[in-house]
Design a protein with these regions (language model features):
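Divalent-metal (often Zn2+) His-rich catalytic cores of metallo-beta-lactamase-fold enzymes
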Residues: 177-242
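Active-site neighborhood of phospho(di)ester-bond hydrolases with catalytic His/Asp-centered motifs
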Residues: 5-7, 28-38, 54-56, 138, ...
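C-terminal regulatory/interaction regions
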Residues: 228-295
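Active-site metal-binding motif and surrounding structural segment of the metallo-beta-lactamase
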Residues: 12-55, 191
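Conserved beta-strand hairpin/beta-sheet module of binuclear metal-dependent hydrolase folds
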Residues: 1-23, 147-160
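Active-site-proximal loop/helix segments of hydrolase catalytic cores
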Residues: 132-189
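Divalent metal-coordination and catalytic microenvironments
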Residues: 6, 21, 36, 48, ...
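Metallo-beta-lactamase
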Residues: 64-137, 183
Length: 295
């Protein structure tokens, strides 16, 4: 019995989560589901020893590419080193800011990358005691392995990072159209009463509707900037955020504009991101808007 969906960004936060749900469940869960491959959803996997860990078939290889704890630790050490940090900031101020923020918020020591042990392709249906659980692959929207966890009887949906609530999304791999299709499926087919987003507070289907409206707005505005010949970074500094100005982390809009630009240029949807350049652009957008960047 018992199932955990995603396992936090580091071991201290994962242990805190285990302690919290220990108040309502007497034993460690026997199942874990990773909604996708990003580090903030899988870095606590190792604490669930003996549990069945479920994820899309792409996750083991994708985790090696995007969730290597050694790389994150190296970034933090470089950002905080007196000489290295100073020199790195001259070249990549955003990368240094990201490394220092991660160091303040998380402790990545002792993390071992533990991939899912049960892999699925399109859909996996399991029984959790008397509750039916559908795990549905919908990626790539935010990432390759995006999966929804749907409980039809309870009408509860765990959306992973397919849905950010009142928080600017970041799309690493995928297309706008794929993301639109998935959000439409949530609203028109699943019709959940409660949605647990990957980031942000609980919501109903209005969260998916708002998310789609945001993405449509950004793509349309990006088209206008693209046609005028502005670079994505320039567009991110100039765009009117309109009704989304109060969303957290508005500077991340750079990634969403750059994703739109890639589509306009007919570039591959899985083209790798230059992490240093991306964080630097996010940093510059934040500075231009007079806010502290959040990575």
């Amino acid at each position: 019995g018992g199932m955990v969906i995603d396992t936090q960004s580091d071991l201290p936060h994962a242990r805190q989560m285990i302690k919290m749900f220990g108040k309502v469940w007497p034993a460690m869960p026997k199942r874990v589901v990773n909604t996708h491959e990003d580090s903030d959803h899988v870095f606590g996997n190792q604490l669930f020893e003996g549990a069945e860990i479920i994820g899309h078939r792409s996750l083991p290889e994708r985790m090696k590419k995007v969730a290597e704890p050694e790389e994150i630790q190296g970034l933090m050490e470089a950002a905080n080193g007196a000489v290295k940090g100073f020199l790195l900031k001259l070249v990549h101020p955003g990368l240094v800011a990201a490394g220092r923020q991660l160091d303040e918020d998380y402790d990545f020591s002792g993390i071992e990358l533990v991939p899912p042990t049960t892999l699925f392709d399109d859909r996996l249906e399991i029984m959790l005691d008397d509750a039916e659980v559908h795990i549905i692959h919908v990626g790539p929207c935010h990432e390759v392995g995006d999966a929804l966890i749907w409980m039809p009887k309870e009408r509860v949906l765990f959306a992973g990072d397919v849905l950010f609530r009142l928080c600017t999304p970041m799309g690493w791999v995928g297309t706008y159209e794929k993301w639109f299709e998935t959000l439409d499926m949530i609203v028109d087919e699943l019709k959940p009463e409660v949605i647990v987003p990957g980031h942000g507070p609980l919501c109903g289907v209005e969260g998916a509707t708002e998310m789609k409206a945001y993405l449509e707005y950004v793509r349309n505005e990006s088209r206008a900037f693209f046609d005028k010949g502005l670079k994505a970074g320039e567009a991110a500094r100039k765009i009117d955020l309109g009704p989304y100005s109060d969303w957290l982390c508005p500077e991340r809009i750079y990634m969403n504009i750059e994703r739109a630009y890639r589509e306009f240029r007919n570039e591959p949807f899985d083209k790798p991101w230059d992490q240093a350049k991306t964080f630097d652009e996010i940093y510059r957008v934040a500075r231009a808007r007079g806010i502290v960047p959040t990575f």
